[in-house]
C-alpha cells in the first residue's frame, strides 16, 4: 500500500489555489502535481481493494457479509476529490487565461482599427480640403490670365490712339475725340490693374493654404505608413513567438527541404555541365582520331594499289623478257629455268670461293656508268612529270622512283644481252656513251612512251627481236649466240622477279606501317568511345541520384504535411472542447 504524503502536497496545492495570478508555468506545474497525486491515489485504492478481496475469499466459508450503511469519504477519497476539483480549477484557469489573451488581442485589434479609422478620416478630410483649394487655385489662375489679357488689350488700344494722335493736326476735331478716348481707356486700365492686384493677393493666399494642407496630408500619410509598419512588425513578432515546438520543427523541416532541393538542383546542373564539357572534348578527340584512321587506311589502300600496279608492270616486263628469251631459244628457255638457277648458284659458289662474282664483274661497268645514273635521271624525270600533272610531291617522288627502277631494269636486260654479245671490254668502253645516249633519248621519250606504250608494245617487241636476231646472226654463230642470250635473259628474268619480290615486300612493309598506325588510331577511337559511354553512364547515375533526393524531399514534405494535419486536428479538438 502506498503512503501518500498529503501534508506536503496539500501545502503546494494550497499555495497554488491561494495564488491570485496564475501564469502558464504555474498552471503547468499544477497539472503535473495533480496528475502525480491522482496516480498515487489510484494505486493506493487498487492495493486496498486487492487486500479486501483476498480476505473475503479466505473467509467465504465461515463468514457471511453483512449490509452496512455507507461510510463517509476516507482520506484517499477526499484526496481524489480534491485532485479532481484541482484539475477542473486549473482547466478553468487555463481557459480563462486563453480567453483573456484573446480578449486582449481583440482589444488590440480594435484599437488598431480605431486608429486606422482616425488616420483615414484625417487623410480624407485633408484630401477633400486640398482638392477644394486646388480647384479655387485653378480658378484664380484663370482670373489672373483674363486680367492680364484685358490689361494687354487696353494697352494696345492706347498705343494705337497715341500713334494716331501724333499724326493728326493739333487743332483737328478728331484729335480731341481721340484724346477723350485715350483718357477713358487709361481709366479702365488703372481699374483693371487694381482688380488684378486683388486677384493676385487672393491667389497667393489660396496658394499658401494649399501648401499647408498638402504638407499636413503628406505628414498624416507618413504617420499612417509608420503605424502600419509597426503594427505589422508587432503582429509578425507575436506570430513568431506563438509558434509551438511542433510548428518550429515544421519550419525547420521546410527550411531543410528548401536547402536540400536547391543544393540537389545546383549539383545536378554542375554535374551535367561537367559531363557535357567532357563529352564535347571526347567527341572532338574521336573526330580527330577518326580522320587520322581514315587517312592511314587511305594511304595503305593507295600504296597497295600502287604496288599492285608496279607488280603488274614488272610481271609484264618479265613476261616480255621471257618471250624474248623464248624467241632466241625456240621455246627451250621455258625448260631451262633450272639451268638459270644453277648459274646463279654457281655464281654464288665462285663468289664465296674467290671473293669475286663473274656476273657482278660483267655488269659492274654498265651498272655504275649507265644504270645507276640512268635510274636517277629517269626517276627525276618521272617525278617532275607527275608533279606537273598535279600529283602530290611525296607520292610523285615515290612513283617516279619505282618507274625509274623499272626503266633501269629494262636497260639492265639490254646490258645482259650486250655483255653476252660483245664481251666485257667492249661493254665497258661503250657504257659511258650508251648511258648518255640512252639517258637523253629516254628522257625525251618518257611522255610519249607512257602514252603509246600499250598500243606499240607488240611492234616494239617484234622489231627488237628481229633486229637482235639479225645483229646476232652477223656477229657469230647463231645457235650459240641465241643460247647465250637466252640464258642471260632468263637470268635477267630471275633478277627481275627478285626485284619484283623485293618491291612487293617493301610495299607490304610500308602498307603494314600505315595499317599499324590505323590500328593505333582505331584503338584510341575505341577508347574514346568507351569513355563517352562511361560519361553517359555517369550522367544517368547523376540523374538517378537527383531523383532519389527528390523522393527524400517528397517524403519530408509528406511528413511535414502529416504533422501539420495532426496539429490542426488537435487545435480543432481543443477549440471544440473550449466552445462546449
From Swiss-Prot:
For whether the record's keyword set contains Transcription regulation, the answer is no
Q: Where in the cell is it found?
A: Secreted; Host membrane
Highest taxon above the source species: Bacteria
Listed GO cellular component terms? extracellular region; host cell membrane; membrane
Protein keywords = Host membrane, Membrane, Plasmid, Secreted, Transmembrane, Transmembrane helix, Virulence
Q: Name one Pfam family in it.
A: T3SSipB
Membrane topology value: Multi-pass membrane protein
The disulfides recorded in the entry are: none
Q: Which InterPro entries match?
A: BipB-like_C, IpaB/BipB/SctE_N, T3SS_SctE/BipB
Has keyword Zinc-finger? no
Q: Where is the signal peptide?
A: none
Membrane-crossing segments per the record = 313-333, 399-419
Provide the function of this protein.
Component of the type III secretion system (T3SS), also called injectisome, which is used to inject bacterial effector proteins into eukaryotic host cells. IpaB/SctE and IpaC/SctB are inserted into the host membrane where they form a pore and allow the translocation of effector proteins into the cytosol of target cells.
Q: Which family does it belong to?
A: Belongs to the SctE/SipB/YopB family.
Q: How does it assemble?
A: The core secretion machinery of the T3SS is composed of approximately 20 different proteins, including cytoplasmic components, a base, an export apparatus and a needle. This subunit is involved in the formation of a pore, called the translocon, in host membrane.
Its protein name is Type 3 secretion system translocon protein SctE
User: Per UniProt, what is the name of the gene that codes for the protein in this document?
Assistant: sctE
